[in-house]
Structures are given as structure tokens and as C-alpha cells.
């Protein structure tokens, strides 16, 4: 299982004829791991942020789901804190806007689970 950029794996699986049947989060120390049960099949398209959050109902029922959301929110905050928007170039401005949008989506989902 990849530990970074898991959304890339999700999107690759979807685009190459695989279906994510189940997602489980596992925790070891401070690290969260994503465990996937994958079969051949069709999945409806999903966005990059949906791929990071999880694309199956099992993810939303996982006891570590809130912790997973908080981790994703913290990653966005680190991006936002690392970019000086006043002096940012076009690429950094786009990264900033994406992180801001993603953070808002994640916060809204987290609010529903708190």
C-alpha cells in the first residue's frame, strides 16, 4: 500500500478497470494505513478529494475515519501556512486555492461526523 498520494492509486484503479470494494484504516503508532480490498469491476468516477477521503461506505463507518479527516485537514493547513499568497507565483496560487477549497470540504465533512 502506498503511504503518500493514495488518491493517485485510487484514480489509477478506477481508470484501469478495478473496483474498490472495501476500505479499512489501520493505526500503528502515529501512522494511519489504508487497506483496500480491490476486485475487477466498474466504479463511478470520483474526484481527487473523494479519493483521499474514501470512496466506499465502509470508509465512513471506520472508527478511525475522524482521525483520517483531521490528518487530511492538517495537511491542507501545512500547505496554506507554507505559501505566502502575497508573493506567490501562479503555480503556488493554484496550490493555495486548491488547499483552501479542499480544507473547506474536509471541515464540512468532519463537522457531520463530530
Over which residues does each language-model region extend?
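Class I S-adenosyl-L-methionine
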Residues: 1-114
